[in-house]
Amino acid sequence: MTFLRPILALLAATALVTTSAQVDGGYSKKEVTPEDMELLQKAQSNVSAYNSDVTSRICYLKVDSLETQVVSGENYKFHVSGCSVNSDNELGGCANQNCESSKYDIVIYSQSWTNTLEVTSITPVK
């Protein structure tokens, strides 16, 4: 039985490290997948998916990184380079790749079992 102690100690240490890396209720870094890009394009290009208090209108040039947060669905925080636009027809990926870009955080809430997809915030990064 003494040979099991080191194994159990290793398993306990692994569990502790794994749980401390994920902050409860916090955001976790995530590799951007094609499905994530599809979700961003679908939500960000559709003005009817915008929460009523989201007044910023941008197109995105590229996704720099992504974080997710599990809530009653999932929050996706896309860190993007993008440009301010004047028309809802310009939302989504930037058609003009030569626009003057800035950094933004776009938060999208998704709840797959209710088909909810909502842009909850677009914030310039300072």
From Swiss-Prot:
Q: Where is this site: Reactive site?
A: G25
What upregulates it? Expression is up-regulated during infection of host tomato.
Q: Which SUPFAM superfamilies match?
A: Cystatin/monellin
One GO term in the molecular function aspect is: cysteine-type endopeptidase inhibitor activity
Q: Where does it primarily localize?
A: secreted
User: What keywords does the record list, in alphabetical order?
Assistant: Glycoprotein, Protease inhibitor, Secreted, Signal, Thiol protease inhibitor, Virulence
Residues that carry a glycan: N46
Any one Gene Ontology cellular component term annotated for this protein:
extracellular region
Q: Source organism's superkingdom?
A: Eukaryota
Signal peptide residue numbers: 1-21
Q: Which InterPro entries match?
A: Cystatin_sf
Assembly with partners or alone: Interacts with the host papain-like cysteine protease RCR3. Interacts with the host papain-like cysteine protease C14.
Entry similarity comment: Belongs to the cystatin family.
Free-text function comment from the UniProt entry: Secreted effector that interacts with and inhibits the pathogenesis-related papain-like cysteine proteases C147 and RCR3 of host plants. Inhibition of host proteases by a pathogen extracellular protease inhibitor forms a specific type of defense-counterdefense mechanism between plants and microbial pathogens.
Q: What is this protein called?
A: Cystatin-like cysteine protease inhibitor EPIC1
Q: Which organism is it from?
A: Phytophthora infestans (strain T30-4)
